[in-house]
Every structure is written in structure tokens, then in C-alpha cells.
């Protein structure tokens, strides 16, 4: 990890990266297994609407990944807050997070997470601990992310593809749907956007799974508003703005709900939250699922 230091954010780099990701996605689309992000657009917020979503909105989710998920008190918690504001009066959203810092998908035993009390709270009934049991189908969706550079490394990319296939099969065997979370480029390595997008789109196509285009949302945001800092000082992990942008992208991609106008802002300035909501929704609307 780099020592904390200030860093510049360059609009031109964001535009170039997003354009490159567009080119790759378009090529994959011609091959019959890709998504097509749209180019940066005006920042005016579109009217709230619904994107194409699963047949039934997930009521529960398991997040499997690394520190990109658990920074800022956990991305899953922010998604829960966004859902609570977008679905007033509906039964609560349930989630669990299985994350290990700096790890890839090959570190996770997804099968074990589906066992009774495999993951979840431990309520106590004195004097005996009663383990939670969420039944035969503890989760509706499992949102998975590999380590930030694993899909790009020649020796680790095959491991990513293998784990994507094995974990998808495990998730479906337990009655849930797999979802792949496309991670973002490092602030000082914008060229990561294109190959990461290609790797996750390919994984989604190979396994008939949805993809959350968070990496493309980051590139779009940087291109449109470089003053909104999406990273902490290490230039890799998300700032609160970065986590919020990613959570808004999950809301649109997995639940088909527009984040635009959502009252939950994670304590961010209203104008910044509105911009991030808009960028997330624009990205989701312009992204064709594999």
C-alpha cells in the first residue's frame, strides 16, 4: 500500500479511459457477450425510472469480496439505506458481508457460507447460544468481486474465471443468483478501467450473471466531475463518495431502482450526492447486461 499522499485527478484521463472501455465493450457486443457503456453525458439528472432488473427484487444479499466492500462501514449498509428510502413501508432488506482484505475470490468458500448459520448474526438465548438459521435459501443474490488487480494478472486471470464459474454454480445450486461487481481503476492507473470492464463482462456472459458496472461509473464520474474525490489517500480504496457511487450503481443494476432523488445521501453534500446518483443511473441505463 502506498503512503498517504495527495493526488491529482485528471479529467482527460477519465474521458480516455471511458472511451477505451466503450471500445472494448462494443467489440465484445459484436462477439455476442458484452455490455455497452455510454459515453459521458450532460450532468442533468434524468427522471427517476426503473432499469431492467431480476424477475423479482432480491430481499436478501450476500456480499463476497475484500476491503473495497467493507470500507466506509460497508457498501451493503449503504445499499440498505438507499433501499429503505426507495421502498418506504416495505419489509427490510437483509444482507451479510463476507470480506477479507486483499483477497481474491479463490480465498472464499462460498459453499460454506450457505450452510445453516454459515454467515449471519449470533443471537443468544441464555445460557446457550442459538445460531441463526435463515432456512434453505438464506440469500436471493450473491454479489462477488475479485481482488482489485487479479482479473488483469496473467497468472491470476484464469483463477478468476475458474472461481467465477465455480461460485456461480454453487450460488445457483442454493437457489440464489450470482452477480459480479466490476471494480474500478486505481486513481493513478486509469488504464485499468478497460481491461477490468472486459474481464467482468466476460465473466458475466460466461456464467449468465448480472454485472454491476461500478468501474464504469467511477470513470464517468471522474470525467464529469474530477473535483468529487472517489478515493482515499492510497488511490485505491473508496472514499465515502466512492462507496456511495458504487452503492447507487448496485441499486440500479441489481434492484432496477433509480437512485436519482433518493433521500439517503450518506451525509454527503446534497449537490455531490445528487451528481453521484445521476452518474450511477446514467451508467446503469447505458450498460447492456451480458
Residue ranges and their predicted role:
Residues 70-155:
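Conserved SGNH/GDSL esterase-like catalytic core that processes O-acyl groups on lipids
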Residues 45-85:
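N-terminal module-boundary/linker segments of secreted carbohydrate-active enzymes
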Residues 40, 46, 237, 247-290:
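Conserved catalytic region of serine esterases and O-acyltransferases that act on ester linkages
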Residues 125-240, 252:
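Alpha-helical cap/lid subdomain in secreted, periplasmic
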Residues 1-11:
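N-terminal secretory signal peptides that target proteins for export/translocation
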Residues 12-26:
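Sec-dependent N-terminal signal peptides
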